[in-house]
Amino acid sequence: MSNFSPREIVSELDRYIIGQKEAKRAVAIALRNRWRRQQLEPGLREEVMPKNILMIGPTGVGKTEISRRLAKLAGAPFVKVEATKFTEVGYVGRDVEQIVRDLVEVAIALTREKMREGVEARAHLNAEERVLEALVGRTASPATRDSFRQKLRSGELDDKEIEIQVADAGGGMGSFEIPGMPGANIGVLNINDMLQKAMGGGRTKTVKTTVKDSYKFLINDESDKLLDQDEVVRRALSSAENDGIVFIDEIDKIASREGGMGAGVSREGVQRDLLPLVEGTTVATKYGPVKTDHVLFIASGAFHVAKPSDLLPELQGRLPIRVELRALEKEDFRRILTETEASLIKQYIALMETEGVELEFTEDAIVRLAEVAVDLNASVENIGARRLQTVMERVLDEISYNAPDRSGSKMVIDAAYVDQHVGDLAKNTDLSRFIL
């Protein structure tokens, strides 16, 4: 767990997300509180619960991105789920406990990756021995092996093709599922794992690859042999329980409006199933039981039709921190195009560079792109920052199509060029409803 201060966390989020200071502050404090909790004595540490967050705001304003960047910054296990994908227990569909099982799988992958770094040097040496074995065989003399080892390290043999045996991660029978209930028992009964243990280890497969590319397979393979798999699982479960972040999107879609009938019953059932998960329960996974008491839950929704007060009172109480994200304005769009770390403009310039085409956007073009995006959001449907992608694709459609034939040329995009390609379309809202 990183020990960034709230100000540093907000500053890092500012590199990728424009505006939404209140939401950034809320998640920054939540992340810092996790670090603070780790500094407490064990008895008190168990009593400090995370303050779950409810984000309210229209689509495309940064709700998901804030959570995703936060998890990346913290190096924490993170899963994003949509509330509408789940059904209450007893109905056909995924049950909410699958969220925790997915979180554990992410934690296992993250932990294994971190632990591999600690044994990478030894794994590299072991991988080198296996490459030599593939090149000269097991019976080669020490002098021959040393000669090939020097060639291998100098890069002379990089393009030579070899055959290697690596662990077969895919295949097998996978997890057992109850028919008609996809996801119901994933991770609890894994027949593939049971068969592998019965046969004394995992399966292998033969891969044909170049010497250079073989290291990618072999280093991972050798790293896993050096790792204590029980320790990987122990650390991963601890990471999921103490550092895990779950982002539940579209929670407004399972809010039952007053007087609602029919599907409202099932939606309320999903809310009731979420209650113990958010408050703290123990979920059985194939790696062992996982407690959710200290998992941070961030729920979000547009709440166009339903209101936060339409959620079950018990669920509202388990989402104590509420932040409202505002709709984006013209200046926000301009800043998104120019100030973010990997802005759309930087992406398109880099993409065209691969074709030998130099792309340049004038300041008035950027302002015009922002204006068109705002106008379309107002007149058609407000999809937030995602509108910029459709506008940019429309503007650069011709350049992208002809780029291979224009290698070595320079293209300047100004306001007139933007108007020429999307101006009329933006004005005709009936038409743009279907095209943009």
Curated annotation (Swiss-Prot):
Subunit structure as annotated in this protein's UniProt entry: A double ring-shaped homohexamer of HslV is capped on each side by a ring-shaped HslU homohexamer. The assembly of the HslU/HslV complex is dependent on binding of ATP.
Keywords assigned by UniProt, alphabetized: ATP-binding, Chaperone, Cytoplasm, Nucleotide-binding, Stress response
Subcellular localization: Cytoplasm
Function: ATPase subunit of a proteasome-like degradation complex; this subunit has chaperone activity. The binding of ATP and its subsequent hydrolysis by HslU are essential for unfolding of protein substrates subsequently hydrolyzed by HslV. HslU recognizes the N-terminal part of its protein substrates and unfolds these before they are guided to HslV for hydrolysis.
Homology family: Belongs to the ClpX chaperone family. HslU subfamily.
Protein name in the entry: ATP-dependent protease ATPase subunit HslU
GO CC term (a single one): HslUV protease complex
Signal peptide, first to last residue: none
Keyword Cytoplasm: yes
Listed Pfam families: AAA, AAA_2
CDD domains cross-referenced by the UniProt entry: RecA-like_HslU
Gene Ontology MF, one: peptidase activity
Residues reported in the UniProt entry to bind ATP: I18, G60, V61, G62, K63, T64, E65, D249, E314, R386
GO BP terms, alphabetized: protein unfolding; proteolysis involved in protein catabolic process
Principal location: cytoplasm
Claim: Transmembrane is one of the keywords in the record: no
The gene coding this protein: hslU
